Amino acid sequence: MIEEVKLVIGMAVLQYGNLRIDPNQRRVYVHEQVGELTTMEFNILYYLALHPGWTFTREQLYRYAMPDDFASGLESVTSRIYKIRKKLNINAIQTVHGYGYRFEK
């Protein structure tokens, strides 16, 4: 469950414990420290966090997070999930074996 949602210029700032995701500034904070993510990493994290508990396939995440002209494959989603976990040191993104990923508190 989202602990706090603030509407700023129409986009929700999400807060889950020590993790805050601000789509307006395109920033992620962990323990109030800025986490550096690429655009695609941010898009994946925000989309998953916006729908906690929902499970998405790699294809669904790819279509949401990747620009239309990005010619990478679905494996790029797996790679970016790994990088998000490593950069932010969070366990909120769960792997659903044989299907995809979901965000859990």
Which residue stretches match the model-derived regions?
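DNA-binding patch around the recognition helix
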Residues: 10-13, 36, 79-81, 85-105
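A structural signal for short hydrophobic beta-strand segments in well-ordered beta-sheet cores
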Residues: 19-21, 93
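Positively charged, aromatic-enriched patches within helix-turn-helix-type DNA-binding elements
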Residues: 27-39, 43-80, 86, 91
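A cytosolic small-molecule/anion-sensing beta-strand core signal
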Residues: 23-24, 97
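Basic, amphipathic DNA-recognition helix from helix-turn-helix-like DNA-binding domains
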Residues: 1-16
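Conserved hydrophobic "DFG−1" position in protein kinase catalytic cores
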Residues: 21-23, 30, 103-105
